[in-house]
C-alpha cells in the first residue's frame, strides 16, 4: 500500500522509528534510508536473530531498543554507535559482550539482563559515562575488579546472578544511589560497602548472609534496606545510624531479638520481622514515631511491648501465629490503627482500651481462646470482625450479657467462647491418629469426604442422630458454627459434668508454631474434633472416642437409622432456656452428657439470640447508655434469671425492621442437610405481651435484639462573639443569593472554611454553619458581596448569629446497622431429598423489589443521568437517605443503554457500596476517570424492567400465577423456580441435572455464552439460552462434572432461561456459600473436536478467517451468527499441509483462549500471537457446497444488502492470519485479479446489460441484483446510523444513461438495441478487464485524527443548519429552490456530478435511477417517488414512518433538508469558483489561442439518441465561450489552490467511498472534466487500445494524480 508514492521523496528526515511487536524477522530495509537523521530506533519484542552490517551504518543513533528478540550475537561493529546514549538488549541469547563496546563513550543507560553472559569484557569499565547498568539474570560469577572506574554509576542491578563476593573497588562508586544484589550467593559483605555516601536503596534479599557488617551504619542516606530470606541471627547495634531509613525488611531470618538501637530510626515507616524466632520485641520500638506498618507474623512472641501505645501513626499491626496470651492495654494509644490481626494466638481476653483506637476497621482474633468481647468495642466502627476461620460474613450480630466472673457487661454471639474449658485442651492437642482424618490434606482445601462413622450398638439415641456419612471439613459452612454454639451453651450450664474418659478435641488446634520448613498456618490444619458439620453434640464423645478398627453397623441397623433419622436442627423459642441445677434434670447415673432439650418432639428449643443471618453485614456503631441496659434487663428478664423474650412481640415505634420470627432466626437458606422448624409456644406469646419500660430510642424485637430509632438532625441557633485579630477572623464564606448554593438549594451564607488557630475557631465557629446576622445586619437573602462587606465592616468585635445542624444519636442505644439493609430477612426455604425446590412463602408487606446490573460506557457528554439523595443532601424520597436516579438525559449513554429508569435506587457503583454513602462520594465515583461504570440498581417490581427481547427463544411453559414467587423487599434473590415450572423443564429431550459448586472464594472455572440479548452460536441455534462455552481443565466446574455445551436453566433457584447475558453473569457471581446450577445436558455442537497443528520454523499458518462480533457475519447462511469461520486455507501453509482445517469450519478456541464473543480484530490478533504449536477447538460451521462461491470467498459479497444494511463490506471482517494488513488491504490481497471491486462493477455496467455482464464477471456466479432500498427489518433504528449506512452502500450512479429496469435472468440485450455510447462503454469494459492488474492501491493523505476533526466540523455545521431548517420548516419557508437553476415545478437541467452520491445520503430520497435530476426539494422528492412507483414498484419502498418515532422522523426530515441545502449552497459556491477562475485567465489569452482551445470549441460529435442531462452538462461546459481560454504559459496551480472551496456533501459520511466513485466514473464527453472545482484537461487524440498513459495528461487534479488504468478517458468517435 505504501509503494504507490515514493516515500523517499516525501520525508527522509525521520528521527524516530517504533517497530515494537511487529513480528519482524529481519531489520526492515526502509530503516537504512534514514541513516542520516535517525536517532531513536525501537525494535523490541520481535523475532530478530541477527543484526546485518548495514544496520551499523546508523551512526546518529542515540537510543536503541532490541529487547525480547532472538539475537544470538552482538557484533563488534556496535562500536560504530559513538553517539549511543541508551542501549537495551535484554532478554536475548547473547553469550558475550564484544570488547569494542568500550568505544561507545556516550553510553549512559545499558541493559543486558536476561542473556547467558558469564563475564564482562575487560574494557567495559571504560564506559565512564554509564549511569544506569542492569545485569539481572545473566549468570555473572564475579564483577570486574576495577568496577569502581564507573564513577558516574547511579543505578547498579545485579539480581539473580551467581555472585559470591564483591570487589573492594565498589566503594569508589560515590554517586551510586541504588544497588540491587538480591538472589545471589553472597555469604559475606565487604566492609567497604559502608563507604557509599549517596546510597539510598540496598537490596540483599535471598542470599546466604549470616551477619551484616557494622559499617552499614555509615549509610546516612539509606532509605530502604532489604535483607529478607537470609540466615541472619542478629543485627548490628550500629543499625541505629541509618537516620533516614523508612523501610526495613527482615522477613524469613533466624533473628531472636531486635537491637535497642532500632529506636533511633525516627523515620522508619515499615518494619517486617515475620517468620523469625523472636521471643520478645524491644521496648525501644516505641521510639519509632513514624512507624505505620509492623509485621510480626509467625514468631514465638508471648507478649507485645507496652511501648506500642506510643506509635500514634501505626495503621497496620499483624501478630498472627504467635503465642500471645495477653494484649497490653496501652495498645489503645495507637490512634491511627485501622487493621489489627491477632489470629491463631492464645488470647483469653481483649482489653477494653482497644476501644480507644477510633480508626480501627478490621479486627481479626480468630483462633484464640476468647470467652467474650469487651462491651466497649461498640464504640468502634468496625467493618470486619473475625472470630473463626470459616466465618461466613465479616460482621456478626452480638448480644450483651453479664460476665459470670467479673459481673461486667460483655458482648457475645454464637461463635463465642472460642475454645472449650482448659481441662479439655490437652486432649484436643494430643488427639490420637485414630481420631483425626486418615487422609488429612496438607493445607486448607475445600474437600468433601465420606467417613465410615462407627457407632455403639447399645447407644440407640446416638444412632438415630449419627447417620452422618457426608462430612464437610475445612469449608466455611455455618452448620458447624451452630453446633459449636450448641456445645458452648451446654458448657455454660453448671448442671452438666463430663466424664474423664470422654474426650472432645478442640475445634482449633493451637500449638502450631510455624517454622520456615512447614509453612502451615494454624487455620490450615484439619480440625480433628470439630464439634460441627451438623453432627449432634451428644454423640461426639462416643463417635470420636472409638477407634477406626471397630466394626461398622450392619445393613439392618442402617435401615432402621434411615427410618428414624431426623436432621439435627437448631430450634428456636421465645424464652431463654434456663439450665437446671446439677442433678435435677439432665444428668444420667453414668455422667454421660445428654442434650439439654428433649428430642424433636419437645416444645423447648435452643434459643439463638442476636445471631444474624450469615449473609448479613452488621457493624457495632454505638455504645448503649446504662439506662438502656436497665430497660433491657427489666423488659427481658421478668424472672430475674437471664435474658428472656419478654419483649419479643413488642416492637416499639422506632423499630427499623420487624420481621417474622422465622425470618429473624434464619441462619442458612442454602444448606442441603438441614430442615429448620420454628416452634413458638402459645404461652410464650402470652408472656411476650409484657412490654419493657418506654425509654427513648429503645425497643426490642422477637429475639430480644436491642433496636434504636435512626439518628435525626436537630437545628439550633447560636450567637457567638469573635474578637478580630491582625490576621482577620480566620473564616471563609460561600453561597449567597445568585451564587452557587453551598448546601442543597439553600442560597444562604455558609461558613466554608475555618482556620484551626483563628479567632473564629476559638469562639466555636464550625464549617457548615449558616450565617444569619453579623452585628445586627441580617444576611437572609443577601448576596455574597453583601455578606463580605458586612464582615469586613464589622469592626474589632464581631457578633454573629449562626444556624447549625447537628446529628443527634438516639440515647440509650446499641446500633446494629446492617450494611445492606435490603438484604435482611429472607423467608426460610424447606428442602427435599431430590432437586431442591423452594416452597411458596407468604407475601411480605411492602413493595416488591428487583435488582439488575447496568454497565454504562462514558461518552463525550458523560453518562447522561443525574442522581439525587444520599447523606448530606436533600432526600429524593421523604425519609429515605438512599441515592436514586433523578433524571436521564435524552440521547445520552444511559438513555441509549435503556437499563436505567428514573427512581432506581443505586446500591453500588463499581463495586463500592452506596447504601449509606454521601452524595458527594457518589458524584466523585461517577465522575472519575474510569471509562465504564457498573451500577447495581434496585427497582420496585411495579415499574417496567429493562428490555430483554427474546427473538428466538421458545416461550416458557405456562404456569399458574401462584407458582412463581417474586422477591420480597428484604429478599436478595430474584425469581425462584416453582415445582411445576421445573417439572415442565424436565420433560425435555435431554437429561437435566443439578450441580452443586461450593464457593470457596476462587473462580468457578467456566465461561458462558448466550442470553436473551446475545447470540449463543454455536450452541442452541434452534433454541437459544445460556450455555457453558468453556470449562477450565482443572477448575471447579470441571471437577463438578460440567461440560461445554451444557444449558444452564437456573442458578440457585433463579430461572435464567429468559435472562439477559448480564443477568446470567450476575446470578453466577452473586455471593453465596454454594452455587446450585440446574443444567440440561444438551449435546455439544456437531463436529466439535480439538486439532493440534505444528508449524515449521518460519512457516506461515496459511488461513484466513472471517466474521466476529459487532461486524460482518462470517456465516453466509445466518446473518445473526457472530462466530469466527475459516474462509480460506492456503495449500502452502501449515494448515494446508495438515489438511484437517477446511473452509467453513467454526473456530471456538485457540490455545485454550475462547474466540466466542470476540470481535474480528481481537480474533485475528489472538491467532497471530500463537507460536509454533496451534491447538484449536473447531466444530462444523457452514456447508460451502450450499453457498455461492462469491459469498464464501474472502473479501467478496455478492449483494451489498444481503448481509444487512449496517455492514458495509465484507472486507471489514476478513483477515489473513499471516500478515498485518488493514481490512482493505486484506481484501485486496485475497481477491482474484479484476478491474474493480464488486460494487465498482455495478456502477460501471450499463443498466440494460446487468445480468449478462455480471454473469461473466470473475467474482459472480449468479445474476447480480441491482441495489434496492432495504426492507424495514434491516433498517437501523438510529437515524444517524441510517445515514452512514446509505452513504456506505453503493447506490445507482448518476451517469447511467437510461433508467434501470427490473433485472431479468434472460440473455444480454442485442447490440442493435444499444446506443453508441453503451456499445462504446461495453467495448471499453471488455478491453480493459483482462489488462487491469487490480484495483489501484490508494494511500490516505489525510490522517485519521484530521479526518475525524473534519467530519466533526462538518457535522457541527450540519447541526446548525438542521436547527435553522427546522425553524424554517415550521413557517413553510422551504418552498423556494435556492439553486437558481430551475423553479420548484421544474427539475434542474444541469446537476453537478456530485449530486448523485449526495442524494444517496437520504433514506427517503434515493438517487433517481438512470441518471435523472437530483432530488433537492420536497416537490422533487415527491415526483421522484411517483416516478419510482410507476417504473419500478419493487425499488420504491420508502422508509416506513411507522418504524420511526415522531422525534426520529423530524430529525430525519431535518437532516435531509440540511443535505439539500448544503448541495444547493455547494453548487452556488462552485459556480462562483469557476467564474473567478475564468475571469482571472480570460484577460491573458484572448489574443492567443492554442490548438487545444480551438479543438475544444469545435462542434461536438453527433450526439447519441438519448443524451442524459449529465452529458448535456458536459457538452455545454466544453463549448462555453471564454471558459477554456488558455495562456501560453503553464497553468499556475498555486493560484488555483488558494481559491476557496469546500468538500462535497457526499464526502461528509464516507469520503473514501465518494472519491472511489469519482475514480470509477466513465467519461460523459471526451472534452473537459470538472470535479469539485478541479480542472482536468486531456489531449483529445485517439488513444491506443487500452488505457491512457500518464504522458498524455497535461493538467491533473490538484487533489490526486491521474494514474494509469483510470476510467473516464475513452476512445473519441470520429
UniProtKB/Swiss-Prot annotation:
Transmembrane segments: none annotated. SMART domains: LRR_BAC, LRR_TYP, PDZ. This is Protein scribble homolog. GO terms for biological process: cell differentiation; epithelial structure maintenance; positive regulation of epithelial cell migration. Residues 1-809 are annotated as: Sufficient for targeting to adherens junction and to inhibit cell proliferation. Residues 548-557, 960-969, 1396-1408 have a biased composition (Low complexity). Ubiquitinated; targeted for UBE3A-dependent multiubiquitination and degraded. Residues 417-441, 462-608, 636-692, 940-971, 1214-1448, 1476-1524, 1581-1614 are annotated as: Disordered. Interacts with UBE3A. Interacts with PAK1 and PAK2. Interacts (via PDZ domains) with VANGL2. Interacts (via PDZ domains) with LPP and TRIP6; the interaction is direct. Interacts (via PDZ domains) with TJP2. Interacts (via PDZ domains) with APC; may mediate APC targeting to adherens junctions of epithelial cells. Interacts (via PDZ domains) with TSHR; regulates TSHR trafficking and function. Interacts with ARHGEF7 and GIT1; interacts directly with ARHGEF7. Interacts with CTNNB1. Interacts with MAPK12. Interacts (via PDZ domains 1 and 3) with MCC. Interacts with DLG5. Residues 479-494, 1217-1232, 1315-1327, 1345-1357, 1418-1429, 1483-1496 have a biased composition (Basic and acidic residues). The gene is SCRIB. SUPFAM superfamilies: L domain-like (SSF52058), PDZ domain-like (SSF50156). Scaffold protein involved in different aspects of polarized cell differentiation regulating epithelial and neuronal morphogenesis and T-cell polarization. Via its interaction with CRTAM, required for the late phase polarization of a subset of CD4+ T-cells, which in turn regulates TCR-mediated proliferation and IFNG and IL22 production. Plays a role in cell directional movement, cell orientation, cell sheet organization and Golgi complex polarization at the cell migration front. Promotes epithelial cell layer barrier function via maintaining cell-cell adhesion. Residues 944-959 have a biased composition (Pro residues). GO terms for cellular component: adherens junction; cell junction; cytoplasm; lamellipodium; plasma membrane; postsynapse; presynapse. Keywords: Cell junction, Cell membrane, Cell projection, Coiled coil, Cytoplasm, Developmental protein, Differentiation, Leucine-rich repeat, Lipoprotein, Membrane, Palmitate, Phosphoprotein, Repeat, Synapse, Ubl conjugation.
